[in-house]
Structures are given as structure tokens and as C-alpha cells.
């Protein structure tokens, strides 16, 4: 593997590609950094204003430095990718998008890191394309089914859906205050960037609400099929996750053929950001061994 960590910014890595979806074509945005022989794809969560870069900007450079090519996909309906109303499985839609992207880039096999919705989508991709998956890292998602201890939808999910319906700075603050364990770590610049990204694409916000109306269960439960996944999997969770409770992660570990789990203390739903240094070391070691 080779390492190239110079000039890794959102702008310098920003790219677009057109892929087939259904009877037509859609445009995907992605960030592409590094030149390694192995590729790591990172899939973001479903919050308003989310993007590959916003979710994983603290994690790109360590992976590139370790010798990987790193691709951050903006899923359809988020950031600079095309809008979409999803009346079926969002997980499977994102899995198809990832396959289309990899086919377009002529990449056969990847490791996938998925946060929340991205974890669900990684599982969907692994089930549909097992031969194209090296290792999986799943944080705060992965379709392990509903929590056995916390009423669904959770506090965090209710706030997320409320923010989609009323995209205001006050509602953003309410959601972010339970998104992470220590909300004091959220800078004004971070909050403003999230707000700007959210309001820049009101079509995405409106389409998410339309999608929920068309199909309230956007992320189907793959729990009964988890045993089909043979890829080595690292499940990472925040002990204090108020969006997707920790017991959901335990069900992933119990269901998959070859999974292990790490639980971060004093951590909410954003492990790769809240504990970035430890997370990066752990993931680089897991992928290498």
C-alpha cells in the first residue's frame, strides 16, 4: 500500500458519477482520497444535513496514512447527490447505489464502515454482494432489529424526524444535544455548517418526510439473515447512544458469523467523531489484521 495524506479536503476530493437506478440514471456525489491497493468505503447516517464528509472528516487522514484508498459516498437524498423519494427499503437503495459506484470506478472488493443508516446499508450490501466485501465496521446501526429495552422510536429518532419536518436551528440543537454524549464539544462552526448543509437542500428534507409517509419502515430488519454474513465485522457502539440503543449492537454480534464488539463509555451515536483517535487506531488495526 502507498500513503498520500497531502491536501485532503472536501473540495480537493469531491467527485460525481452517474449510475443506473431503476429505469433511469441518478448522479451520486462522493469524496475520493488516497491511492491504496485496498479501498475503504464510508457510509454516513440519515440526519438532516448529513454527508460523507461531515460524518467522517476526522477519520479520513488516518486511513489514507495507513495506505488505503478512502471513498465517502453521499447517499441519494443527501448533500450533493440527487434527490429521491424512497417508498421501499432505504438500506437496499443505498446498497444498489454503492454497487453502481463501485462498478463505475471498477472496484471489485471493499471494506465498508457504516454509521447508523450507513451500517444498515453496509449490511444490505454485504447480503446482496458477499463476494465484494472484505471487512465491515458498523457503528450505531446495522438492522439488528428494535431494542428490547427502549421504546421505539427512540428519543433521538423522534428529534431527528421532528428536525426534518421543522428544519430550524433550535430543533437542530435539540437533536444534536442528544446525538453526542458531551454536547459542549459541538462548536458553533460545526453547528452552523450542519445548518447550512441542511438548508441548502430543502428538497432532500421534503423528500425524506415524503419517504416516511410512503413507507414508515425505511430500514427493514435483516436480523433473521445476519447469519449469512461471513465477513469479519467490528461492531462499535456508544454506551450512551440515545438514537439506537446498545442492545441492538449486541444482537448484531450474536447474529453474525464472525463479529466482535467494542463499547465506548461516555459516547453517544457518533463514535467515530466523539472518540476519533481511539476509533481510528482500532479500525486501522482491525482492517490490517
From Swiss-Prot:
Name of one Pfam family that matches: Abhydrolase_1
Superkingdom to which the source organism belongs: Bacteria
Biological processes annotated in GO: 3-phenylpropionate catabolic process; acylglycerol catabolic process
Cellular component per GO, a single term: cytoplasm
Active site: residue positions: 269
Single annotated GO MF: protein homodimerization activity
Enzyme Commission numbers on file: 3.7.1.14
Keyword set, alphabetical order: Aromatic hydrocarbons catabolism, Hydrolase
Annotated ranges, domain AB hydrolase-1: 39-275
Segment forming the signal sequence: none
Keyword Hydrolase: yes
Assembly mode: Homodimer.
Function: Catalyzes the cleavage of the C5-C6 bond of 2-hydroxy-6-oxononadienedioate and 2-hydroxy-6-oxononatrienedioate, a dienol ring fission product of the bacterial meta-cleavage pathway for degradation of phenylpropionic acid.
Annotated protein name in UniProt: 2-hydroxy-6-oxononadienedioate/2-hydroxy-6-oxononatrienedioate hydrolase
Organism, as annotated: Paraburkholderia xenovorans (strain LB400)
